[in-house]
Every structure is written in structure tokens, then in C-alpha cells.
Amino acid sequence: MGAITGVDGVDVVIGTSSFLREFSHGKDMAYITKTAIEVIEFVKTKGIEVRFSSEDSFRSDLVDLLSIYQTVDKIGVNRVGVADTVGCANPRQVYDLVRTLRGVVSCDIEVHLHNDTGMGKASKTLLVRLFTLLGQLLPTHTQR
């Protein structure tokens, strides 16, 4: 819908953790990947920016997560987003995931953190300090 209403960009978001796959939408990673490709390719035909984000990134299987990010990067998303949907990731986990992701995608990386446990602000501070030299890391957004 956003692609036909004149927006500048669209965020394609789907839950990738086993929790969300089982209790939210009931889809497996093959279905998620196939659907993401179809939606991203459609959005790209509209000439607008497209970001792919996984919901609940930090409780998702790392192999699954990196695989889908690599796939959407290859088809040309402008950026990928990782989300600490429930505010459970500590700064080291955020650093490790973003650093690993930087090694498998060439697009921009965006980080979305929640501060439920107080880790969002700490993670944001760490990311700003550690990734200043790496480039292509977009500013983080912390929600309470």
C-alpha cells in the first residue's frame, strides 16, 4: 500500500525468531524469505527506498538471520534493520550481531533498540563509539 501512496520508502518487516514464527504468523524461514523477495522486488519497481527488518532479531537463529539478510542484500535493499524487539540484548550482543552482519551485507545497517531492561541506551552508546570508523551504520533509535 505504501508503494502506491507516494511515500519515499517502505520497511518490509517480519518476525524471524522461533517465538514469532510459532506464535505470531506461523511461517517457516523458507516462506519468509520467498515472501520478502517478492515484496522487495515489487517495492523496487516503484522506485522507492526499501529496507528489510527482522522483528525479534536477537532471539532469532543466527544462521537463519544472516541467510535472509544476505538474500535481501543481493536483490538490492537499501538497508537492513536489526531489532531488539523485547529489549533483551546487552551491548555485547548488539555489537557482535552488527559486526557479523557487516561481514555479510554491503548495504546500510540500521539498528532499532528498545530500552525495556535499560540495555537500549547502553547499546546505542557502544554502537556509536565502536562503529564510527566502519561507516554505513545508521543512527540507532531507542524507544522506552
Where are these regions (language model features)?
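Alpha/beta enzyme core
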Residues: 1-109, 124-132
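Active-site capping/gating regions of soluble enzymes
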Residues: 73, 112-114, 118, 122-144
